[in-house]
Swiss-Prot record:
Family, per entry: Belongs to the MG032/MG096/MG288 family.
InterPro entries the record matches: DUF237 (IPR004306), DUF240 (IPR004319)
Tree of life domain: Bacteria
A UniProt-annotated Pfam family: DUF240
Name of the protein this chain belongs to: Uncharacterized protein MG288
Amino acid sequence: MDFEVDYEGGNNTVNLQFDLKAQTSNFLNLQELQNSFNGNDLNTQLFWKPLINKLVDKNQNDLTSIAKTAVSDSLFLSNTNIFNSVLKIDEQLDLAKTKFEKEIIEPFKKEREKAKADYEEQQRILAEERRKQEEELKRKEEEAKRLKEQQEQFNKSFENAKEFKDYWKNQKKDVTDKTQLIDALKTSFAADKNKTFSLLINSFTKATSDYYKNNKKDESENAKKAFSEKGIQFPRQGLEGLYMSDWLRGKLTSYTDIKLNLTSIKIENKENNPTIDWKNNGIEFRQHYPYKFKFEIDIKYQGGYKLTGLFSWFAPFSGIPSSWNGEMDVKFIVDGDLDYNLVQNTDYPGSLFQFKDNQLLFTLHVKEQIKVQDGKFMDLLKQQNLHNLDLRNGATKPPVVDLASYLHYLVLNS
């Protein structure tokens, strides 16, 4: 059966064209079939299914696909008196129409009206959001321009100590003051760890070269302010700057009049891109290979010694050659190769990159290589492994320096 109806509601009118297919269950026996002819009531089940042909609104928007999806394969069941259904077909059609309107059309209409209202509200919200986003975008563009200029200035601060000093001066910090320098380094490190670390390593090498300019240690007020009265922590000048066993140091200082005069110092960078392996909140205490950098320090001395006093009479029993004179070459290979076995030593100072007590404590991995031309003295150095000594423990464990002091020295002199 084909139907076509118009429904009006709100500000909209829809035209619906549909088929209604009905089917009863089969008669179970002959008596039921006879009852249908003698006027007796016959109750049975009626299955009926709506089929949507077309649904359009007053603007000729075709909603047929949506209606078909909503109705889908709906199948309706009702207990029906066949006698009344056949003889009172108009009533049954009205009943079917009413039921269809109630169960299909009205819910569908409410759903679409709600969907329309939701859509209009969503569009209003989106329009408001777009307006806010446009305003925010304009502010962000202005802010980005300002930040870009600041970022360029910030990036320039990593180039050298003078640029670092000038940048932080504009940020109202006087980094010639050690406390403010440490505070600036903390901020800089939080913003860009590797660039700050690279600045510190480069400052280490340059400050060392400047400190020993003209082959003499700097005893100026700036040097004392940066490194204290004790002077630079590494590398130190003379016998004090050489790593060796307590036994050999005792022999050379107690038995001889050894003197070492600095004739040259050269530093060569071997890693152009220093990096630091930051773990969560910092460098772990026994972290191996915590940072990547490398430079070599070549130092030349002219010096010598001889046994003094009574020790000169017992030279064969002193354990060291009776005298030495000539040139001494010292090479320090400095890097971040703190290997697993090294960091597990009981007297290992720790893989430090730590701000503490107005300092930036920093653990170095160092190899020391000492060479002299004198055969006897060189044999002694080899016996002590000073020709290729890896600083690991005891009197020759890895040194810890205040890394910030080297940058501070350059800042004071810039």
